[in-house]
């Protein structure tokens, strides 16, 4: 099957650009967002969490003060483009306007409208492989405000219930100096059974019965994160820039788990952008059939 796409309604998210290549399905919202709301091997379940009821949102008074009366940010699910460090309400921009897009063969470009107040303009450029379950997701962040701003591109993959995510610990020989970062958030309970750590990997699982969230971050020098769910391995690779300043005390990857979903997040270095300047960050995606639940089988995804 050759690569093809059509625009159609999907769930409660409105119109989506629905891309298929015989191996993989990838849907992107264009009535809002954008969000990469569906990602799966053909015949397998969606790897992305979908909040079909639009029940998870922020509409606090300070958010409405900044973005307008009635403003509401919905998580929706799927992959989204944010800017780190996280701030409330600035980060929770209510991206509910239609998204312009272009298609050039296997390259799909989505232009979110310029954000009011922050002045950020976000563009997603998705290149889908012609025949294999692979895609490149380029994030371009442009400072369209009238002031210099500092931020990092933050790609958040909101994956479905039941998943487990892993990253490899940094193993560079730095002699007498520390070689890895492991950042913890205030709400973490360190005896939480969702959290996994051995000499090689750090992992986090999703549990629908969890009462508290759990979040960890690390300096992912290997540039690889893997999420296992629904008989599928979702591998995300990025470039790590040694010596660069990363958000959250040096994190280039973060994982967040709650009762609804599991997030696998990648971050670019922090960039200081003058008006009109832009930076970019690329995630490369691959999907594999994977039925093993044995951590010993993870190594093949980190070679």
List the model feature ranges, each with a label.
Residues 1-136, 140-303:
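Surface-exposed acidic/polar loop and edge beta-strand patches at domain peripheries
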């Amino acid at each position: 099957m050759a690569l093809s796409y059509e625009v159609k309604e999907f769930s409660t998210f409105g119109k989506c650009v629905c891309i298929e290549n015989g191996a993989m399905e990838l849907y992107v919202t264009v009535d809002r967002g954008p969000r990469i709301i569906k990602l799966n091997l053909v015949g397998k379940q969606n790897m992305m969490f979908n909040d079909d009821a639009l029940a998870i949102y922020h509409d606090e008074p300070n958010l409405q003060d900044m973005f307008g009366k009635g403003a509401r940010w919905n998580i929706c699910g799927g992959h989204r483009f944010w800017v780190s460090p996280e701030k409330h309400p600035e980060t929770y921009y209510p991206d509910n306007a239609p998204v312009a897009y272009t298609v050039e063969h296997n390259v799909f470009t989505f232009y979110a409208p310029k954000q009011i107040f922050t002045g950020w303009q976000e563009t997603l450029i998705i290149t889908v492989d012609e025949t294999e379950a692979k895609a490149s997701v380029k994030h371009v962040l442009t400072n369209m405000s009238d002031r210099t701003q500092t931020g990092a591109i933050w790609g958040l993959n909101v994956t479905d219930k039941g998943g487990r995510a892993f990253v490899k610990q940094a193993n560079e020989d730095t002699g007498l100096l520390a070689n890895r970062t492991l950042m913890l958030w205030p709400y973490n309970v360190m005896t939480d059974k969702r959290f996994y750590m051995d000499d090689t990997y750090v992992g986090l699982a999703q549990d629908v019965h969890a009462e508290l969230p759990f979040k960890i971050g690390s300096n992912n020098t290997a540039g690889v994160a893997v999420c296992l769910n629904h008989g599928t391995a979702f591998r995300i690779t990025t470039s790590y820039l040694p010596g660069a300043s990363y958000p959250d005390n040096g994190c280039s990857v973060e994982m967040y788990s709650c009762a609804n979903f599991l997030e696998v997040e990648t971050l670019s270095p922090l960039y200081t952008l003058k008006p009109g300047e832009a930076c970019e960050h690329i995630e490369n995606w691959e999907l594999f059939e994977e039925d093993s639940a044995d951590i010993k089988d993870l190594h093949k995804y980190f070679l």
